[in-house]
């Protein structure tokens, strides 16, 4: 995964086009003056005051004009393009940390952040641009670690797609097998690799959880069970449990899920 990031970065040969021609998105806060014939002069840019942001140039007007001047000779016109989605989503860490507000305690306490969880297909977009923007504005990385997950594939190991009609929602799976069975299946996934939707694993997980539940219910149903008295086998179990917790914690901290 790191090699994919390196290859993308090292082979960039063009500038980042930050504008998109779409009907939705974050507006680019720019107007342009029109000449005496009503033609747009794209070199004569009108910028809003920072204190007025955010603005929509298709709705708001520059200070020296009125709405009636829009599209008229010696008037103005608003920028029609919107920002590339990665231009704005690459600011996610700063937005969460409330960068730019008067109280910067939260920004100073959580930025840079610890972990960015994301999928592998947007390494060259979301991960790359977020790092670029963090260096541009703060001269630092936005987070210490990136945790890359794979895709959930259908039973035939094909990418799930609405157009193909092979999407399986987690809600239906949880209702059929239970949340713990789904967790059991998810625990079998390896970091950075794709995982197949496998009902056999859900069935195994469901049976295992049911056995654990019944065993716990059986133990707790006996009044003779003395919680304050430890037998040798109880102490051995607690030692093994403590060792397991320490090992699992160590693995999690190293992202060895």
Question: What residue spans do the PLM features occupy?
Answer:
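Active-site-proximal, well-structured secondary-structure segments within enzyme catalytic domains
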Residues: 231
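Structured secondary-structure scaffolds
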Residues: 1-228, 237-257
């Amino acid at each position: 995964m790191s090699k994919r990031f390196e290859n993308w970065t090292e082979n960039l040969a063009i500038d980042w086009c930050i504008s998109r021609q779409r009907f939705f998105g974050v507006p680019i806060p720019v107007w342009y003056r029109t000449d005496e014939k009503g033609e747009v002069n794209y070199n004569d840019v009108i910028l809003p005051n920072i204190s007025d942001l955010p603005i929509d140039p298709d709705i708001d007007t520059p200070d020296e004009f009125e709405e009636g001047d829009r599209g008229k000779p010696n008037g103005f016109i608003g920028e029609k393009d919107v920002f590339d989605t990665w231009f704005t989503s690459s600011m996610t860490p700063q937005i969460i940390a409330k960068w730019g507000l008067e109280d910067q305690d939260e920004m100073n306490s959580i930025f840079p952040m610890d972990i960015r969880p994301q999928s592998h297909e947007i390494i060259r977009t979301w991960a790359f641009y977020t790092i670029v923007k963090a260096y541009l504005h703060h001269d630092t990385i936005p987070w210490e670690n990136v945790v890359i997950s794979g895709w959930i594939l259908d039973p035939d190991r094909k990418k799930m797609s609405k157009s193909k009609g092979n999407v399986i929602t987690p809600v239906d799976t949880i209702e059929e097998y239970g949340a713990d069975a789904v967790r059991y299946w998810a625990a079998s996934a390896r970091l950075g690799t794709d995982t197949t939707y496998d009902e056999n694993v859900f069935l195994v997980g469901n049976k295992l959880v049911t056995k654990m539940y019944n065993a716990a219910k059986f133990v707790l149903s006996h009044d003779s069970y003395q919680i304050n008295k430890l037998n040798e086998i109880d102490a051995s179990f607690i030692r093994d449990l403590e060792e397991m917790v320490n090992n699992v914690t160590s693995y999690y901290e190293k992202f060895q899920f």
